[in-house]
């Protein structure tokens, strides 16, 4: 069979069925991601003055870290100062 015939026949066939079951919706993916995080980490919700939030975001940007990573480093640093 020539390549042109092969190309025509392969593209005209039905698409292969998804083999791993039904794909998850974006909401389901997000829910599973949060569940995995909750298994290992504790959630902290805080309200900051806008100037402190801007400082936090600046630190994150400069260091290339997430907010969680910056806050963890700050807490560790303060804990060492206090001998906790």
Curated annotation (Swiss-Prot):
One Pfam assignment: RepB-RCR_reg
Compositionally biased residues, Polar residues: 1-13
UniProt region (Disordered), positions on chain: 1-31
Alphabetical keyword list: DNA-binding, Plasmid, Plasmid copy control, Repressor, Transcription, Transcription regulation
GO biological process per UniProt: plasmid maintenance
GO function terms (MF aspect): DNA binding
Stored InterPro entries: RepA2
This protein's record includes keyword NADP: no
Function: This protein is involved in the determination of copy number in gene replication. It binds to the repA promoter thus inhibiting the synthesis of the mRNA for the initiator protein repA.
Protein name as catalogued: Replication regulatory protein repA2
């Amino acid at each position: 069979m020539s390549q042109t015939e092969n190309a025509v026949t392969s593209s005209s066939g039905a698409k292969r069925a998804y083999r791993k079951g039904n794909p998850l919706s974006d909401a389901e993916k997000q829910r599973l991601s949060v569940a995995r995080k909750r298994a290992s980490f504790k959630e902290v919700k805080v309200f900051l003055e806008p100037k402190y939030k801007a400082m936090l975001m600046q630190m994150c940007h400069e260091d290339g870290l997430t907010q969680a990573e910056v806050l963890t480093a700050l807490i560790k640093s303060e804990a060492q100062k206090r001998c906790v």
